[in-house]
């Protein structure tokens, strides 16, 4: 569970640079916060508990990389990560979600991560057992007298032949009938009631623990059956109590909670009436879990003292100082993310590992179509994105998705008929596709 000591703050920023353009201050802040976790683990136990994480408040318009920075950071260190929106929560007693469900969901994520890792450790053993079970369905072992099974070394040549065929994938499409565990569902009438997700998961847990698990027969291909049996066997081989313990520890020490739209629950100005009272109620409910408390979960009690909280908001109408003082004090690190410029858009289109241009080229290549964006086309797209963001709502890099979809719409639709062809997107074509939309203010507002 220890954080990799090789990841220095500089290396963390370099890793984030592969996916996110600019925003150096924000990257630096999260890199230091992450490194401090590793430093804390090296301290003597009595001092370790005293060192609490420095939570971060990110301030900046939508689409500039706030969420992406936090998500990539969590992936980097295999930390449990959850993103929640502050507006989805209401103060206790009103319709809405209970803030403690944030921690319950975080531990769920942690549990799934640890379980997947442990199952991977026993994957080879589970695969061997699954293969034997599939062979039992295909070529049942011959019973000896008095019903005892023949020894392994005496198994029939047919079974040995089938084993080879199974390993080589020659039986993948053959259909077999197998017994599988029946999953219990506790959904009532398909109705989702806000705030009752936790009760539903607890009901599922309760029903699944009542008596032996039911099994039902299913007809599947050998490939599908192998996967299902392999997962069932892997679950039997791992110690679920150990998984739960590790999941709680990982959530407590490595968990990252990203609270988006925190500005929407800030009271605006000096007024404290109407909706502002409810907003303050949400902040006061968030305060205990950010300060450090113990939350009961189905995996056991979870201490929130060392969970890293990253809050974010555009703060167009409210200011960070409009948050209640106690909550402000729990987010000592403030970073402002800059609005994106034309140069940033050019980099976003081309530089990251998952750059949008690379994505479109890869998607079209699946249809046998070669796609190329010229340098002047990329400059033109970036220029248009900047202009539209200035004239209408500033939605940051998300504007590029809208513009590129508009440009690629016809090509994507006709791609199966364009196999073997090369499409070159230049600035002239970009202007043709977007010309009328850009010049007409009303169309821009609705289409881009």
Curated annotation (Swiss-Prot):
Q: What NCBIfam families does the record tag this protein with?
A: hslU (TIGR00390), PRK05201.1 (NF003544)
Function summary: ATPase subunit of a proteasome-like degradation complex; this subunit has chaperone activity. The binding of ATP and its subsequent hydrolysis by HslU are essential for unfolding of protein substrates subsequently hydrolyzed by HslV. HslU recognizes the N-terminal part of its protein substrates and unfolds these before they are guided to HslV for hydrolysis.
Signal sequence, start to end: none
What does the similarity note say?
A: Belongs to the ClpX chaperone family. HslU subfamily.
Name under which the protein is recorded? ATP-dependent protease ATPase subunit HslU
Q: Which GO terms describe its cellular component?
A: HslUV protease complex
Note the subunit structure. A double ring-shaped homohexamer of HslV is capped on each side by a ring-shaped HslU homohexamer. The assembly of the HslU/HslV complex is dependent on binding of ATP.
GO biological process, any = proteolysis involved in protein catabolic process
Which CDD domains does this entry report, sorted A to Z?
A: RecA-like_HslU
Where is ATP annotated to bind? 21, 63-68, 260, 326, 398
Quote one Gene Ontology molecular function term. Answer: proteasome-activating activity
Show the InterPro entries listed in the entry: AAA+_ATPase (IPR003593), ATP-dep_Clp_protease_ClpX (IPR050052), ATPase_AAA_core (IPR003959), Clp_ATPase_C (IPR019489), HslU (IPR004491), P-loop_NTPase (IPR027417)
Q: Which domain of life is it from?
A: Bacteria
Question: Which keywords are on file for this protein?
Answer: ATP-binding, Chaperone, Cytoplasm, Nucleotide-binding, Stress response
Q: Where in the cell is it found?
A: Cytoplasm
Organism encoding this protein: Sulfurihydrogenibium sp. (strain YO3AOP1)
SMART domains according to UniProt: AAA, ClpB_D2-small
